Swiss-Prot record:
GO terms for molecular function: ammonium channel activity. GO terms for cellular component: plasma membrane. This is Ammonium transporter Amt3. The record marks 157, 305 as: Twin-His motif. Important for optimum substrate conductance. It comes from the Archaea.
Length: 388
């Protein structure tokens, strides 16, 4: 790689690493004050877990030599046989794996033990994230059939969003959910997290070009375009039911960012307007559906990341025109391939997450006690409080 490309990759890696604590702020503002430290800590712990797991095992599962299209072999275990010139790519992909695990905190907030999250995080990254990353990016079978995922719509967002749904269904509702309102305690904190996520997403998407080139420039612009349209469309959709909330603007921006992720290197800015606009409305509708169904997926990872990732994967097959072609450009087959990849990732992540979560529950128990939940996880899990 040229020195300029190395510099851009390192900057992008730092931006993506920033996204995990930014997600902690985004989530932390939406929980009650008695659980804010626990929620943010889980996101930091996700970064720590994956940083170690990736070096020891994760990278070789995802990017080792292909074995039957399903997994990488152990050629890179402990980063053995990885040249120093590839360390930037290793770190960049590690940051992706870390935030993917952190997204799942949405389904665990305010009721799950830290010890259970530690064990689950190791297992989930190894048996869900790493194999899907290999299928799509590491020369696996989805890459072989021609499925497109520029920066992680399938690998990151579908896998985490539908894993969060599986966990929410298994863990069950927070005590009092549906009986009284469980309100966010600090929306400005969530807005700060949104701003940092939006900023970091430029590294997430434009950095996935792996070079400082025209593809990165395109990805940078369409990322911002889709985020803006997502924020506006969610805001206007919610306005039809009442006042437009600041939390809706934040969620819409994230929905737009999620949806453009798989498409960022393949679509033009006009297509990004459509992708982001649809994402805001579709993800808002998914959130309303979740609430109506009584599913306590606390911070809406399923609605925003799962559904947004599904739409983004499909939209890539519709609008791709830069470096690949989709339905609009006359390639209907690409749309079919995108649907296949999205459905496979959805089913695999959901089912394997259920299995892993049941195993963790049997081993150490997932939920805190009702008394611990009542006093809050900040005190019961950390013996700390956020505010005095």
């Amino acid at each position: 790689m040229q020195s300029g490309d190395i510099s851009w990759l390192l900057i992008s890696t730092a931006l993506v690493v920033l996204m995990t604590p930014a997600l902690g702020l985004f989530y932390g503002g939406m929980v009650r004050a008695k659980n804010v430290l626990s929620t943010i800590t889980m996101c930091f712990v996700a970064l720590a877990i994956v940083s170690v797991q990736w070096i020891l095992l994760g990278y070789t599962i995802a990017f080792g030599d292909d074995v039957s299209g399903l997994t990488g072999n152990l050629v890179f275990i402990g980063l053995r046989n990885v040249s120093m010139s590839d360390y930037g790519f290793v770190a960049f992909q590690m940051a992706f794996a870390a935030i993917t695990l952190a997204i799942i905190v949405s389904a665990l907030a305010e009721r799950v033990k830290l010890s259970a999250f530690l064990l689950f995080g190791i297992l989930w990254t190894t048996f869900v994230y790493d194999p899907i990353a290999h299928w799509v990016w590491g020369g696996g079978w989805l890459a072989g059939i021609g499925a497109l995922d520029f920066a992680g719509g399938t690998v990151v967002h579908i896998s985490s969003g539908f894993s969060a749904l599986a966990l929410a269904l298994l863990v069950g509702r927070r005590t009092g959910y549906g009986e009284y309102n469980i309100e966010p305690h600090n929306i400005p904190m969530t807005l700060l997290g949104t701003a940092l996520l939006w900023f970091g997403w430029f590294g997430f998407n434009a950095g996935s070009a792996l070079e400082a080139n025209d593809v990165a420039l395109n990805a940078f612009l369409v990322t911002n375009t889709s985020a803006a349209m997502g924020a506006l469309s969610w805001m206007f959709a919610s306005w039809l039911k009442g006042k437009p909330g600041s939390l809706g603007v934040a969620s819409g921006a994230i929905a737009g960012l999620v949806a453009i992720t798989p498409a960022a290197g393949y679509v033009d800015p006009l297509s990004a307007l459509v992708i982001g606009g649809v994402a805001g409305v579709v993800c808002y509708a998914a959130m309303l559906l979740r609430v109506r169904a009584g599913v306590d997926e606390s911070l809406d990872a399923w609605a925003v990341h799962g559904v947004g990732g599904l739409w983004g994967a499909i939209a890539t097959g519709i609008f791709a025109s830069v470096g690949a072609t989709g339905l609009v450009a006359g390639n209907a087959q690409q749309l079919l391939l995108q649907i296949i990849a999205a459905l496979v990732a959805t089913a695999y992540a959901f089912l394997v997450t259920l299995i892993l979560a049941k195993a963790v529950d049997a081993a150490v128990g997932l939920r805190v006690s009702s008394q611990e939940e009542y006093v809050g996880l900040d005190l019961s899990q950390h013996e700390e409080v956020a505010y005095t």
